[in-house]
Amino acid sequence: MYNDDRSYIYNKAFYEAFFNLEHNPKPTALNSARFDLIRSWAAERGIYDNGNSHTQYVKLMEEAGELAQALLKNDKPEIQDAIGDMVVVLTNLAYQENFQIEDCIDSAYAEIATRTGKMVNGTFVKTESL
């Protein structure tokens, strides 16, 4: 959740875009409109015109580092914030590579939907890799 103590590059805009009840009466419902809001927000700020997928990748790694730190501290608000930030960055990176994040998610799910395997040391390992 955004607050004055946690001010990262995307947080306030993310909070305002997704938790503004005038625009999103159901803030917990995930749908394509949320990704459209991210893309509109990014376009308005020149991220697509002046940035590129390489800089978005660097931003993604920064956010991954913040997630790692939050996980180590078991800081639930920061974990949520970092995951949200990563979704924003991934949405932008996908768009810059001429993909829609929704299609990327659908493609990934189609690949794993029938995957079999087992848990090994806390990680799911697909059968082909065992």
Language-model features, listed with the residues they occupy:
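Flexible "arm" and connector segments at domain edges
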Residues: 2-83, 87-130
